Amino acid sequence: MSKQTLVLLYGGRSAEREVSVLSAESVMRAVNYDKFLVKTYFITQMGQFIRTQQFSEKPSESERLMTNETIELTQKIKPSDIYEEGAVVFPVLHGPMGEDGSIQGFLEVLRMPYIGTNVMSSSIAMDKITTKRVLESIGIPQVAYTVYIDGQDLEACLVETLARLTFPIFVKPANMGSSVGISKAQTKVELRKAIQLALTYDSRVLIEQGVVAREIEVGLLGNDKVKSTLPGEVIKDVDFYDYQAKYVDNKITMAIPADVDQSIVTEMRSYAEVAFKALGGCGLSRCDFFLTQDGQVYLNELNTMPGFTQWSMYPLLWENMGLAYPDLIEELVTLAQEMFDQRESHLI
């Protein structure tokens, strides 16, 4: 039986490129090599496409994907050279230029099926401010927030924020993930510094009311028909779940399924599915919620390319539902092909 080519794109231009490499290495080990041939391409911080390894069988545990230190610049290619008829692309890319619609649009121009959400839903979900406004419009609860856009009057923004929110306040770049650039402010001075830090990552800044809450996550899978998982919980040993805690210090554990009332489970799964459809989602996403002590549910964000390592929440949520990691990858390939066929059928 001939194998289908699965193209892995990893690395990328955003500050989340290290997470991308971890996710891609997990995928390359989990793929069913009876069915797939895996070709990998590293995208440098400057946006260069480098042809890296090819796998026809499961690599050894010591095998690592090539990155900045090990790539061969002689293998630099034109981005369009990744094209291969019949191949499916898994853009295991996080953050700007990865899950913001940019690479998705490129792959649509190439006429290649790809795993994940489309251009529109990727770009909307990547921007935390736009996501909040869309979800508010359909009645999904959001924590109170204000917005600062680079070039506006910062002092006026501080006055407005302190009139509407109380400390602690969280400040986030609108277009970053993996908690990159997020700060917790307890004073006006810290708030100003937090906004200035966020501006180094994005020109749009979300300023959000801090809440004492559990962090609960729901996985989503599907195209026109979407399925959701039972929720899982992020158990924190730190003040908040930042990049260092997530990927460097390993100061988090997960409870899957989360220990929450059935009514809350039903509410979260419903909100997650409605949000996914409202943003035009397809393929996969992970919805992140806050659950307060009094039972209030807030949808914090919708992540269209969640961390995909074997220890990441998203694959583990589906494993808890009976869908093993290799089978999850196969299902995503099938969904990618379905969406490709649907897009092509509309081009008449």
UniProtKB/Swiss-Prot annotation:
Residues 132-334 form the ATP-grasp domain. Binds 2 magnesium or manganese ions per subunit. PROSITE patterns: ATP_GRASP, DALA_DALA_LIGASE_1, DALA_DALA_LIGASE_2. ATP binds at residues 162-217. Pathway: Cell wall biogenesis; peptidoglycan biosynthesis. The keyword Hydrolase does not apply. Pfam families: Dala_Dala_lig_C, Dala_Dala_lig_N. It is an enzyme of class 6 (ligase). It catalyses: 2 D-alanine + ATP = D-alanyl-D-alanine + ADP + phosphate + H(+). One of its GO terms (molecular function) is metal ion binding. GO terms for cellular component: cytosol. Keywords: ATP-binding, Cell shape, Cell wall biogenesis/degradation, Cytoplasm, Ligase, Magnesium, Manganese, Metal-binding, Nucleotide-binding, Peptidoglycan synthesis. Mg(2+) 2 binds at E301, N303. Mg(2+) 1 binds at D288, E301. It is found in: Cytoplasm. GO terms for biological process: cell wall organization; peptidoglycan biosynthetic process; regulation of cell shape. InterPro entries: ATP-grasp, ATP_grasp_subdomain_1, D-Ala_lig_Van_CS, D_ala_D_ala, Dala_Dala_lig_C, Dala_Dala_lig_N, PreATP-grasp_dom_sf. The keyword Ligase applies. Its cofactor is Mg(2+); Mn(2+). Its EC number is 6.3.2.4. Belongs to the D-alanine--D-alanine ligase family. Cell wall formation. This is D-alanine--D-alanine ligase.
